[in-house]
């Protein structure tokens, strides 16, 4: 009865999230849970949530980078919905992907038809030449 029953066993390793194993910020475990609960299929493989989380993280980073550039162009330090709208609509691929998406408080792209712009008068220069 020395009481040394548990001393020889190995200590349990520190838990490591699947996100950190994959080198991601997005939660792989939550994506896996949502895939299972969403009735997309009967079974969900181990790699599917990792891949989906990586894709979502990449798209988010891409949009945030472009929106940050738009905010900096407008001399602002905080990204607002207007900056998201400008970032998405000025990027051809993101605009195609999110073409049917409405961003609240996003506004519209500035666009003036060429016909409506004031005409450059060349007759004024010709009149001086006479």
UniProtKB/Swiss-Prot annotation:
Annotated positions of the N6-succinyllysine modification: 10, 96
* Residues with PTM N6-(2-hydroxyisobutyryl)lysine: 6, 10, 37, 75-76, 96, 119
**Residues with PTM N6-acetyllysine:** 6
Which residues are reported to carry the modification N6-lactoyllysine? Answer: 10
Cellular component terms per the entry's GO annotation: CENP-A containing nucleosome; extracellular exosome; nucleosome; nucleus
The residues joined by the cross-link Glycyl lysine isopeptide (Lys-Gly) (interchain with G-Cter in ubiquitin) are 14, 16, 120
Q: Sites of the modification Symmetric dimethylarginine? A: 4
SMART domains in the record: H2A
SUPFAM superfamilies on file: Histone-fold
CDD domains in the cross-refs:
HFD_H2A
Where in this protein does the record say N6-(beta-hydroxybutyryl)lysine is found?
A: 10, 14, 37, 96, 119
Per its UniProt entry, which superkingdom is the organism in?
Answer: Eukaryota
Q: What are the boundaries of the region Disordered?
A: 1-22
Q: Which residues carry this modification: N5-methylglutamine?
A: 105
Q: Does the keyword Phosphoprotein apply?
A: yes
Q: Note one Pfam family from the annotation.
A: Histone_H2A_C
Q: What is this protein called?
A: Histone H2A type 1-B/E
